[in-house]
């Protein structure tokens, strides 16, 4: 029975799939049955990533609809699918263009993935995707200085003081263990 839903959102090429690829085996090592839903706008090859690591997955292409609106309109079917797969945790990866579709995030652990190389001003441009996030993941941390990373972390804390912050290197997996541990313990009231 589905116990937890984790929403991973962020712009194109920020490393959402790389983060998931690193935390999936860590969550599975905690005896959690996982499934993944990938929602993209036009096309994606990320389904192959999940197929290669042998995890139940489904891909949705939103087309001319915002990926978040597409997600909300398909949530009942998605929960049913995850239940059929006997998943404890459903991981949803979305482009999250508007991320304003509450109640989608009310019963989910909502996460925002941000690329450190984008700019120290990027967090302010993410709007609700960042300000309503339960956790924020910084990627490409190896490509910026410690000082730049601290400035970005400070900007994020300024915009969302309650979000838990993680730095994850999508290539090496550095930092993924802390995120996986936190996600396995994090809980919200759920009524799927």
PLM segments and residue spans:
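Nucleotide-state-sensitive switch-loop elements of NTP-binding domains
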Residues: 2-106, 119, 141
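G-domain G4 guanine-recognition motif of GTPases
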Residues: 10-12, 41, 116, 133-148, ...
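Internal alpha/beta core interface subdomains
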Residues: 19, 129-138, 155-163
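Glycine-rich, phosphate-binding/catalytic loops in enzymes
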Residues: 25, 54, 107-110, 127-129, ...
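Residues at the starts of beta-strands that form the adenosine-phosphate
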Residues: 33-35, 109, 134-135, 164
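Short, glycine/polar-rich helix-capping loops at beta-to-alpha or helix-loop-helix junctions
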Residues: 44-47, 121-126, 148-155
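Inter-motif core of Ras-like GTPase G domains
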Residues: 96-117, 125-134
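Canonical P-loop GTPase G-domain recognition
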Residues: 142-192
């Amino acid at each position: 029975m589905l116990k937890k839903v984790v929403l991973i959102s962020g712009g194109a090429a920020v490393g959402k799939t790389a983060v998931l690829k690193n935390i999936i085996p860590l969550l599975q090592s905690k005896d959690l049955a996982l499934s993944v839903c990938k929602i993209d706008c036009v096309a994606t090859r990320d389904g192959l990533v999940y197929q290669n690591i042998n995890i139940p997955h489904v891909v949705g292409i939103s087309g001319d609809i915002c990926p978040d609106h597409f997600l909300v309109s398909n949530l009942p079917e998605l929960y049913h699918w995850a239940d059929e797969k006997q998943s404890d945790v459903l991981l949803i990866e979305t482009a999250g263009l508007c991320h304003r579709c509450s109640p989608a995030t009310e019963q989910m652990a909502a996460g925002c993935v941000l690329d450190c190389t984008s700019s120290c001003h990027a967090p302010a441009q993410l709007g609700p995707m960042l300000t309503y996030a339960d956790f924020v993941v910084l990627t490409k941390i190896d490509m910026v200085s410690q000082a730049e990373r601290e400035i970005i972390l400070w900007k994020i804390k300024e915009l969302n003081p309650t979000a838990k912050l993680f730095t994850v290197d999508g290539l090496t997996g550095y930092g993924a263990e802390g995120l996986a541990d936190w996600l396995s313990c994090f809980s919200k009231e759920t009524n799927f």
